[in-house]
Amino acid sequence: MSLNNIEEISFCIHQNAPKIHCLTNPVTMQDVANLLLAAGGSAVMGQDEQEVEEITSFCHGTLLNTGVPDIAKIQACILAGQKANALGHPVVLDPVGAGASTFRRKELQKLLQAVHPTAVRCNQEEAVVLCSLLSDTDSPEKHGGVESSLQMAERDVCLIAEQAASLLNCTVLITGKEDVVSDGKQTQILTGGDSRIRQITGGGCMLSALCTLFLCTDTSAFDAVRAAGALWRETALEAGRRTDAEKSGIGSFHVHLFDVLEEKLMYTSKHKF
């Protein structure tokens, strides 16, 4: 991650305080809202189809998280996503547990036919399911789960990221032991971080929100998503150091994530300009 890049993104966020319309997972709703506040933005969480277009219109970006789906929620995601597309606002799709059921696969396919995401943030299993839905290859019935159980080789993750990015014509961030970001033309591997990020519920959901926030700046989609992914790994690394220094547990690690992220973005926004 370029230091200048993250400083410029941080400055822009703190200047404009982007509002993110989050149609998100109720399991992680509070963490997503707190993450956005810590990073310098804010969340609006309207999810009824009677209001989602109106809310989308006064926000700066839209996050579509399909965790805990039902028919009404998917319809609301479609309406909000289409409105964001029409306004030229960034849309991030987080296809939580995409392969967990036939219902989820069918509804996700419906969503993808109606809305064009600017970026997708997913785990390895979800990326495989996305590619299978979009290309009619592989067997999606083999895949499932909100937490990825796949352990693909680095080269294979890169290929899946590139395939998904090309099929969707967007930037894709696949998270795991190492993260891979690709727009189909350029691909980068992100390393570092702390494995404890995978021991808390919502680490991926929070990263998806951070990607949405970073996309609300004058930065290319690839650079914005790459910067968000790299910063989240740096945040986890420092949160882990503080947790270890205190000889504390996973709950303290969770809390430190918010503190560290706020400090990193406040520092960079103040010291560049």
Question: Which role does the model predict for each range below?
Answer:
Residues 233-273:
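Charged C-terminal helix
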Residues 69-72, 97-101, 180, 197:
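Short, small-residue-enriched loops and turns at beta-alpha junctions
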Residues 190-201:
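Short pre-catalytic strand/loop immediately N-terminal to key active-site residues, enriched for Gly-Thr
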Residues 73-122:
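Glycine/small-residue-rich loop that forms an oxyanion/phosphate-binding "nest" at active or ligand-binding sites
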Residues 160-165, 221-236:
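Short, well-structured alpha-helical segments that form the helix of a local strand-helix-strand
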Residues 2-93:
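Conserved N-terminal subdomain of the carbohydrate kinase-like
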Residues 104-187:
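Conserved phosphate/ATP/ADP-binding segment of small-molecule kinases
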Residues 129, 199-230:
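Short, small-residue alpha-helix embedded
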